[in-house]
């Protein structure tokens, strides 16, 4: 038994080990050249093994069928590579229609004649001529006739007959035309026109800058907002924020200009809703007290409201140049020319400045000394009729600018409990400006058009009533100044 099994066993040559046959469903299929090489190697191995075998092995060799060639096994199962674009061949519908029209003697066919040519000459459509199976390809033919520009439609001379389809003598496009997009918000003609106009307008309004304009020595052309000059103030805007906001507004006129250029008060209230603006003249660039260069434009009352302590606060936010220079500025000097100071609509501008240096006392008033007397609390320059009765004060407050000691100060007429503070001599007032806070720096430099500012900023409201004709307490004998002007502004 063992001898029989040993006789049926075939010694395997180590150089030609059995190779596994690839599965028929293997993907990707082996390349033909590789399959041929494997077949040749396998056939040579089998023949060489058969020659080396003995008679017994030659007899048993047919029992083990040789591995079939890979090409014979895989060839029938492999799909032939086809370059056919459609089921009927490589020609498209447009190509078939072109051949049908060219085959006609007069180079023109009706739609039904094109259908007949398809069924007659294209094998794929021979069994699809009935109405049930022809709906799809006939619809495709109609679409191609209308889609391509190489086909033109010519009206038939006979009545009630379909039109002729001919080839475009000018050629026309052979490919598909780009599909039109539906009109939407982004590609509508009206939207594109508006967008183009807006971009052109923005380019025209944008100031042309050269690369050298970015240096500090070359300021950018165009109006510079007043807020940009006082970048450290609370109400100022950063340059980039202003540019973005001005760009959003359309880049028009400057919003913070002179008071006469403002056409309405809404823009003014939007920028500084709680405080008016002070517009000193450009002549205030040089301070007579310090003898040095000061900013060309004094801060607005929106920036001075907090630092001067209009509501009882200190003077920590005052510009350092003014505070430092003021300490060395006081002392005997000639009396400068008095200038008017415009008070805020709600408060006296410099009323609470005495609290800036509370530790330094002031000497009693003497005519040569430059010290000032100030009010302990800000006093309303204008009082609405309803507010006057509620506060227990006299009807609308009265104010007048009069000359006084060197560097004259604007004092409000004090109604009610504050009358004694201004009626008596200034030396008797309990609160005074500290000696180190010299206001001579403002003397002669606060030139402004009072009437223009009053008309633009204060007279727009019908509830305001200004009357500067009322009698003021006589000034103390030590004060040498002009009498109060008898002039009234009544809103019309």
From Swiss-Prot:
SMART domains: FH. Coiled coil: none annotated. GO terms for molecular function: DNA-binding transcription factor activity, RNA polymerase II-specific; RNA polymerase II cis-regulatory region sequence-specific DNA binding. Residues 1-76, 163-235, 315-338, 466-492 are annotated as: Disordered. Phosphorylation of Ser-184 is be important in regulating the transacriptional activity. Residues 225-235 have a biased composition (Low complexity). PANTHER family: FORKHEAD BOX PROTEIN O (PTHR45767), FORKHEAD BOX PROTEIN O6 (PTHR45767:SF5). This is Forkhead box protein O6. It comes from Homo sapiens (Human).
């Amino acid at each position: 038994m063992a001898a029989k099994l040993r006789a049926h066993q075939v010694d395997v040559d180590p150089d030609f080990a059995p190779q596994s046959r690839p599965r028929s469903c293997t993907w990707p299929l082996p390349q033909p050249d590789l399959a041929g090489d494997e077949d040749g190697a396998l056939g040579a191995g089998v023949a060489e093994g058969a020659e080396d075998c003995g008679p017994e092995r030659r007899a048993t060799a047919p029992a083990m069928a040789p591995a079939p060639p890979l090409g014979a096994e895989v060839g029938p199962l492999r799909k032939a590579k086809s370059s056919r674009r459609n089921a009927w061949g490589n020609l498209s519908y447009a190509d078939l229609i072109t051949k049908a029209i060219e085959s006609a003697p007069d180079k023109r066919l009706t739609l039904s004649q094109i259908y007949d040519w398809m069924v007659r000459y294209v094998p794929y459509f021979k069994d699809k001529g009935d109405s049930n199976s022809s709906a799809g390809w006939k619809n495709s033919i109609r679409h191609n006739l209308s889609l391509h520009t190489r086909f033109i439609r010519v009206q038939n001379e006979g009545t009630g007959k379909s039109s002729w389809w001919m080839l475009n003598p000018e050629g026309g496009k052979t490919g598909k035309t780009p599909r039109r997009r539906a009109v939407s918000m982004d590609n509508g003609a009206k939207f594109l026109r508006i967008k183009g106009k807006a971009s052109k307008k923005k380019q025209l309004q944008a100031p042309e800058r050269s690369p050298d304009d970015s240096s500090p020595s070359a300021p950018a052309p165009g109006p510079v907002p007043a807020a940009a000059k006082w970048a450290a103030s609370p109400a100022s805007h950063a340059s980039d924020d202003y540019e973005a906001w001005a760009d959003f507004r359309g880049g028009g006129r400057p919003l913070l200009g002179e008071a006469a250029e403002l056409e309405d008060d809404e823009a003014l209230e939007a920028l500084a809703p709680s405080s008016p603006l002070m517009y000193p003249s450009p002549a205030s660039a040089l301070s007579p007290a310090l003898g040095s260069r000061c900013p060309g434009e004094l801060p607005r009352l929106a920036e001075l409201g907090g630092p001067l302590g209009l509501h009882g606060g200190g003077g920590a936010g005052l510009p350092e140049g003014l505070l430092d220079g003021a300490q060395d500025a006081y002392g005997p000097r000639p009396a400068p020319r008095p200038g008017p100071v415009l008070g805020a609509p709600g408060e006296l501008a410099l009323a609470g400045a005495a609290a800036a240096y509370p530790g330094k006392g002031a000497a009693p008033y003497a005519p040569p000394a430059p010290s000032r007397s100030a009010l302990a609390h800000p006093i309303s320059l204008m009082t609405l009729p309803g507010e006057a009765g509620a506060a227990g004060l006299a009807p609308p407050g009265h104010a007048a600018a009069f000359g006084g000691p060197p560097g004259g100060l604007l004092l409000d007429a004090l109604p009610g409990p504050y009358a004694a503070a201004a009626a008596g001599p200034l030396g008797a007032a309990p609160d005074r400006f500290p000696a180190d806070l010299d206001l001579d720096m403002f003397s002669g430099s606060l030139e402004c058009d009072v009437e223009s500012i009053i008309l633009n900023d204060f007279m727009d409201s019908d509830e305001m009533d200004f009357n500067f004709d009322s009698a003021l307490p006589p000034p103390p004998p030590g004060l040498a100044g002009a009498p109060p002007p008898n002039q009234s502004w009544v809103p019309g």
